[in-house]
UniProtKB/Swiss-Prot annotation:
Recorded superkingdom: Bacteria
Family annotation (Gene3D superfamilies): SecY subunit domain
GO BP terms, alphabetized: intracellular protein transmembrane transport; protein targeting; protein transport by the Sec complex
Coiled coil: none
A Pfam family assignment: SecY
Protein name: Protein translocase subunit SecY
């Protein structure tokens, strides 16, 4: 009986992995279906010129869909942005904060609000893309075959539907597959661009544009970067939590101590992604006017990768969102109240406000280190790419996302296997009894 249960659990895990792979294949197929009314030759010419610009990272996150102007050109970024905005608003806006406390029903309502906001943001971005495409002209002719109202409407509908389809695929992976669907969609997009980035680097080395020593140094640097990211992502500060002793009859229960782990990088990869979104926003607004305007030229120059203004704003925004998102993920006051409710306490700290202040003190120190770690990981590759013209697929943000997704997915698989073995063990015990 135990063997049958173990076999059933193993088959369930395999089916979940197969389902996840199938959904990701659909995402990749969609990234090669172009939106209607585009001259592919002219578009390729434009994409080659802008592969190292500020739009390069978003092309990387979309798995090349933005460069090919496919139905998934906006990727799942509008949904991520909408979710983050709703989370930020839930801190400042009381009705949303109350919804979070309503449990499963409140969670469903918040998810629905995120979807509505996704449609709004995707529509805004899609219209900006349509206007940008209409303004693009190359030596072979305009990118848009027949510009006008019909093209704009078609583009907006196509891109919004593509984003909503990706959102749905991500939700299906989360519910019926393995790992976080949204993260895996971004992950597969980044991974798809790695082979071409490696080929491009070795091609530059072969032609003499990049010395073999630098190419080898980059490869060693990549391995070290991955090791550093794994170290910092796994780093924790463990706080001792003591539970009081309780006497029930002649027996004494409790009194044991446990540890509360606080991650060094509590905010995850959200700060660099959202910081990049903020830096892209002025450029998106400029596209509504004229792409050849002085404003657009200034924005393109000052917000170019590796430029001092871009680097400074990038670091400031990463630090800001590190603190802001950590405050959302970990509520010190709520955690302190929960500990007091169960009679637990931090040794040397009084329950309640004293404990809450202690959490804030620890988190502030951790977040400073975590924010600096994120800034260094994201900024150093930016400077190197600007100097040696290496593809954005090898950027710091992409490494952060890939390593985090792999670690999270592996943890979920291990948790699933452990819970399956635990359930099998419990069934065996019940059968013996």
């Amino acid at each position: 009986m135990g063997q049958n249960f173990s076999k059933k659990s193993s088959n369930d895990l395999v089916s979940r992995i197969i389902f996840t792979i199938f959904m990701l294949i659909i995402c990749r197929i969609g990234s090669f279906i172009p939106i209607p009314g585009i001259d592919s030759i002219a578009l390729n010419s434009v994409a080659e010129k802008n592969q190292f610009g500020i739009l390069g990272m978003f092309n990387m996150l979309s798995g090349g869909s933005l460069g090919r102007m496919s139905i998934f050109a906006l990727a799942i970024m509008p949904y991520i942005t909408a979710s983050i905005i709703i989370q930020l608003m839930s801190v400042a806006y009381k009705p949303l904060e109350n919804l979070k406390k309503e449990g499963e029903s409140g969670k469903r309502k918040i998810n629905q609000l995120s979807r509505y906001l996704t449609v709004l943001l995707a529509s805004f971005q899609a219209y900006g893309v349509a206007l940008s495409l209409e303004s693009m002209v190359t030596n072979t002719g305009p990118v848009v075959i027949l510009a006008g109202f019909f093209f704009r409407v078609t583009t907006v509908i196509t891109l919004v539907v593509g984003t909503m389809l990706l959102m749905w695929l991500g939700e299906q992976i989360t519910q019926r597959g393995i790992g976080n669907g949204t993260s895996l969609i971004i992950f597969i997009g980044i991974i798809s661009g790695v082979p071409s980035a490696i080929i491009s680097m070795f091609e530059l080395s072969r032609k003499g544009a990049l010395s073999p020593l630098i190419a080898i140094t980059v490869c060693i640097g990549v391995v070290l970067l991955i090791a550093i990211i794994i170290f910092f992502e796994k780093a924790q500060r463990k706080l001792l939590v003591q539970y009081p002793k309780r006497q029930v009859g002649n027996k004494i229960y409790g009194g044991e101590a446990t540890h509360m782990p606080l991650k060094l990088n509590t905010s995850g990869v959200i700060p660099p992604i959202f910081a990049s979104s903020i830096l892209l926003f002025p450029t998106t607004l400029a596209n509504f006017s004229n792409s050849n305007s002085e404003t657009m030229s200034m924005l393109s120059y000052y917000l170019g990768h590796g430029k001092p203004v871009y680097i400074l704003l990038y670091v400031v925004l990463i630090m800001f969102f590190s603190f802001f998102y950590t405050a959302i993920v970990f509520n010190s006051e709520e955690t302190a109240n929960n500990l007091r409710k169960y009679g637990a306490y931090i040794p040397g700290k009084r329950p309640g406000k004293n404990t809450s202040d202690y959490f804030d003190y620890i988190l502030t120190r951790l977040t400073v280190i975590g924010g600096l770690y994120l800034s260094i990981i994201c900024v150093i590759p930016e400077l190197l790419m600007n100097k040696y013209v290496i593809s954005l697929s090898l950027g710091g943000t992409s490494f952060l996302i890939v390593v985090n997704v792999v670690l999270d997915t592996m943890t979920q698989i291990q948790t699933y296997l452990f819970s399956s073995k635990y359930e099998g063990l419990m069934k065996k015990i019940k059968l013996k009894n």
